[in-house]
Amino acid sequence: MPVTVRVDLESAVVSYRPAAGEERSSLARKVSSEVLLRAAPWRTFRWYFGQRHYSGTYWSSTQGDHVIYESRLELANLLLADFDSRVRQIVAQPFMFRAEVQAQVRKHIVDYLWGTDDGPVVVDVVRAERMSHPGIALLCAWTRLIVESLGWS
């Protein structure tokens, strides 16, 4: 079911970390995908006894380095990307979107950014059964609008 959403695309901001500990921000319409494909992860995952999700690192042959994931579903998507010949780069949690959505400021850290031959691909990993939840549907709708306004997939 499509969600109608109002997003102020002109003021949407992308925040990223060029290196661990640093933070930079840019209007989304002015951000360079090349800069984001070199970004450090926005956050790192935590391990603790009894945690419900499955975090870890995966050695990616595409990246020639470890790539983090926060769930088994993210790991499955990471594996698919690593074996997809069109994917040239894989960056975990590369940036945070901040935008005015439905007259309220919202933030979201995307799961992955893939550099492909056809351009950047933003990946948010969501279990299929959660897509009917109104909050998840809204999140996916407004992030999709920003991504598409940049000419990305």
What do these predicted regions represent?
Residues M1-S153:
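Electrostatic, structured charged patches in enzyme active sites and in nucleic-acid/phosphate-binding
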